[in-house]
Amino acid sequence: MSFARVRTALRCQRAAASPAPPKVQARRFANKAAPHASASSAGSRAFHLGLAAGAALAVGGAGLYLFSRSPVLLDAQLPVKQRGRARSISAAEVAKHNSRDSMWVCIDDEVWDITNFVELHPGGAKVLEQNAGKDVTKVFKSIHPPKTLEKFLTDDNFVGRIDVDEVTKIGGGKNAEDLRIEQARKELRNVETVVCLDEFEEISQKILSEMAMAYYGTGAETEQTLRDEREAWQRVRFRPRVLRKMRHIDTNTTFLGIPTPLPIFVAPAGLARLGHPDGEQNIVRGVAKHDILQVVSSGASCSIDEIFEVKEPDQNLAWQFYVHSDKKIAEEKLKRALALGAKAIFVTVDVPVLGKRERDLKLKARSQNYEHPIAAQWKAAGSKVEETIAKRGVSDIPDTAHIDANLNWDDIAWIKERAPGVPIVIKGVGCVEDVELAKQYGADGVVLSTHGARQLDGARAPLDVLIEVRRKNPALLKEIEVYVDGQARRGTDVLKALCLGARGVGFGRGFLYAQSAYGADGVDKAIRILENEIQNAMRLLGANTLADLKPEMVECSFPERWVPE
């Protein structure tokens, strides 16, 4: 169901409802941006929030929100009525409301009646059913932007407050995974001891929930493409030059006319709050120290407003654009990003439907097992669990109807008309023919990408596509800016791509893992690691500037040994 239909239906329900008695003003859920703090000073403060969310809430790769799948707030805040003295609710009473007929959830210390919202929920009814009568604070905050409650619910849905000591009786306390993560965070070594991006992933495996690791790490189906992307970098070898004056190294360049001190950018990657309470804001703060370009994900767990509000005045952020099937909504989102100051628009074109991400799906299937506590509750209540699962499907891949599956090359003109003077980049290109079409239809750049190997399993690694462009139409590399991502982890990976003609290389998962473990300090450290590796490798390769990186400096051993001309 589209957000427009959700809003219309909710407003109709509210119009038909009888006036509610005056109540005190609702408490806001939006917190002001927390000041930057190092991992060592933050300790375990609030780090457990959002880390041990129930596996039933991680599906596909879009992140299944309890209330809203879109972090972009398109509407003005819905009016909140005055509330009187809040009614005290016991855990036992909350737990009773766990069916379609009466469904309550607890967020922080507040109890909400979401019965009339179940069928309207953009993420589907099942995820609400699985968490009915429970405390959902951790999972809610880990994947939802602030003000989500205020956007979709009114004071009529407010039931009362639950005593803090009662919350643990409905799942609000620390479970075994919470305690494991809390202890692992206490044992984190100093961020300055990390020497490469791979270490951030190794460290994150200890401090992330099973759900977060599945979401961040999964590829599509057999994960052939996920494996192949790492191997692709190893199939390109250097042909270094020696006896050159290598004391001074210059790594400055421009992306889409935007100056950058390094030929790297932060690729869009969603749900950073699964790893850290500050989520995408950590990445913005860490990147600000280095002035490299960050492409803000449309699937972020912070709202677009939250993300842009913590950037430095001169910091450059671009925005990832999933074109909504409702062009009016698509235009509203685009206008909002531009109004906030997005310097470029990265149009994602490789998601006409969501890929089959089996690590996510297997984890969710386990949570839907008949013996799962929620299923046991259904059974006790007389629900037909097997019939429900059979009808809706265990995988329950999130509905992607809001993404325009009919998006085509003619739509590029529509986007350019609504973003005059702003660079447009096509993200998700997988062959030389589509690079040619991108140039033909007026795009300023392309990102050779497989969506993190999360879409079409068996698709070629982006680096192999870059080699194809170099072989079949090398002139394109001077006519349109070509970027590449796909499991790059090293400064040497960046140089290999630049030797083959890429303008720059995007890093996604590496920054997710870095911020998960160490917040903004982790992002800062990751960039410093890459900077050092790039400069060191340039000296060893014999290149003083990025312009000195030439095709003849590499040898490609797949699909055949070949030295580019």
Swiss-Prot record:
Transit peptide: 1-54
Quaternary structure, from the entry: Homotetramer.
Binding sites annotated in the UniProt record for heme b: 121, 144, 215, 364
Any single GO CC term annotated in Swiss-Prot or TrEMBL for this entry: mitochondrial intermembrane space
Residue ranges of domain Cytochrome b5 heme-binding in the record: 86-163
Catalytic function, reaction form: (S)-mandelate + A = phenylglyoxylate + AH2
Main location: mitochondrion
Enzyme Commission number(s) from the entry: 1.1.99.31
Gene3D superfamilies to which the protein is assigned, alphabetical: Aldolase class I (3.20.20.70), Cytochrome b5-like heme/steroid binding domain (3.10.120.10)
Cofactor requirements of the protein: FMN; heme b
Active-site residues, record numbering mapped to chain: 451
Domain of life the protein comes from: Eukaryota
Sites where the protein binds phenylglyoxylate: 215, 322, 451, 454
PROSITE patterns with a match to the protein in the record: CYTOCHROME_B5_1, CYTOCHROME_B5_2, FMN_HYDROXY_ACID_DH_2
Entry keyword set: Aromatic hydrocarbons catabolism, Electron transport, Flavoprotein, FMN, Heme, Iron, Mandelate pathway, Metal-binding, Mitochondrion, Oxidoreductase, Respiratory chain, Transit peptide, Transport
Compartments it resides in: Mitochondrion intermembrane space
Pathway(s) annotated for this protein in UniProt: Aromatic compound metabolism; (R)-mandelate degradation; benzoate from (R)-mandelate: step 2/4
Family named by the database record: In the N-terminal section; belongs to the cytochrome b5 family.
Cofactor note: Binds 1 FMN per subunit.
UniProt: FMN binding residues: 267-270, 485-489, 508-509
Name the record gives this protein: (S)-mandelate dehydrogenase, mitochondrial
Stretches that traverse the bilayer: none
Positions of the FMN hydroxy acid dehydrogenase domain: 189-559
GO BP annotations, alphabetical order: lactate metabolic process; mandelate catabolic process
Function statement: Catalyzes the oxidation of (S)-mandelate to benzoylformate and enables utilization of mandelate as substrate for growth.
GO molecular function: (S)-mandelate dehydrogenase activity; heme binding; L-lactate dehydrogenase (cytochrome) activity; metal ion binding
